[in-house]
């Protein structure tokens, strides 16, 4: 063990205050961990009892009840709509076709003429022309100009 002289020294003022004992101020203590109220305890107890009752419920105590089906009659609006629908379908099915006039159909989407088709084909052929099939040709320019007089 270390000798007393080797231990760290304490401040003289602090050592004197420790020996004399300082007078401490009176302080009011406050609880940081508040205990639950009677209402909280009763509510938790009730909750635990309900859970226990649900877990240990005897389903044999239940009585079966007969199912009563109610027949709902349609409203006046529903009947009116259905009646209108039936009248319309009846009128369509029993429509007198003798009163209709015969008409000739006129073709409004006329097919293009052969010249228009040929013109369109030449444009397509020019756009997709393959130049690799062409052969190289030297051009010969002639400078001989012959003038003939008209008689």
UniProtKB/Swiss-Prot annotation:
Pfam families membership: Thymosin
GO CC, any one term: cytoskeleton
A single MF term (Gene Ontology): actin monomer binding
Record localization: Cytoplasm, Cell cortex; Cytoplasm; Cell junction; Cytoplasm, Cytoskeleton
Observed phenotype of the null mutant: Lethal at the L3/L4 larval stages or at the young adult stage. Mutants are shorter and stouter, and fail to produce a viable progeny. In oocytes, actin is diffused in the cytoplasm and F-actin accumulation at the cell cortex is reduced resulting in deformed oocytes in the spermatheca and the uterus.
Sequence repeat residue intervals: 24-29, 62-67, 100-105, 134-139
Region (4 X 6 AA repeat of L-[KH]-[KSH]-[VT]-[EP]-[TV]): 24-139
Keyword Repeat: yes
GO BP, sorted A to Z: actin filament organization
UniProt keyword terms in alphabetical order: Actin-binding, Cell junction, Cytoplasm, Cytoskeleton, Repeat
Tissue: At the comma stage, enriched in the developing nerve ring (at protein level). Ubiquitously expressed in larvae and adults with enrichment in the spermatheca, the intestinal tract and the posterior bulb of the pharynx (at protein level). Expressed in oocytes and in the gonad (at protein level).
Described function: Plays an important role in the organization of the cytoskeleton by regulating actin polymerization in two ways. Firstly, by binding to and sequestering actin monomers (G actin) inhibits actin polymerization. Secondly, by binding directly filamentous actin (F actin) promotes actin polymerization. Regulates the formation of cortical actin in oocytes conferring them enough rigidity to sustain the contractions during ovulation.
Subunit-structure text: Interacts (via repeats 1, 2 and 4) with G-actin in a 1:3 ratio. Interacts (via repeats 2 and 3) with F-actin.
Description of its domains: The 4 repeats act cooperatively in the binding of G actin.
Family statement: Belongs to the thymosin beta family.
Protein name (database record): Thymosin beta
Organism per entry: Caenorhabditis elegans
Gene of this entry: tth-1
């Amino acid at each position: 063990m270390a000798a007393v002289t080797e231990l760290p020294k304490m401040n003289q003022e602090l050592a004197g205050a420790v020996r004399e004992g300082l007078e401490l101020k009176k302080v009011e203590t406050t609880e940081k961990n508040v205990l639950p109220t009677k209402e909280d305890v009763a509510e938790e107890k009730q909750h635990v009892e309900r859970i226990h009752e649900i877990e240990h419920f005897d389903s044999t105590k239940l009585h079966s009840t007969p199912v009563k089906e109610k027949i709902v009659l349609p409203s006046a609006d529903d009947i009116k709509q259905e009646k209108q629908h039936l009248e319309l379908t009846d009128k369509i099915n029993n429509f007198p076709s003798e009163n209709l006039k015969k008409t000739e159909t006129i073709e409004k989407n006329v097919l293009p003429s052969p010249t228009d088709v040929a013109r369109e084909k030449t444009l397509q052929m020019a756009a997709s022309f393959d130049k690799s099939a062409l052969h190289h040709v030297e051009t010969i320019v002639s400078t001989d100009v012959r003038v003939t007089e008209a008689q």
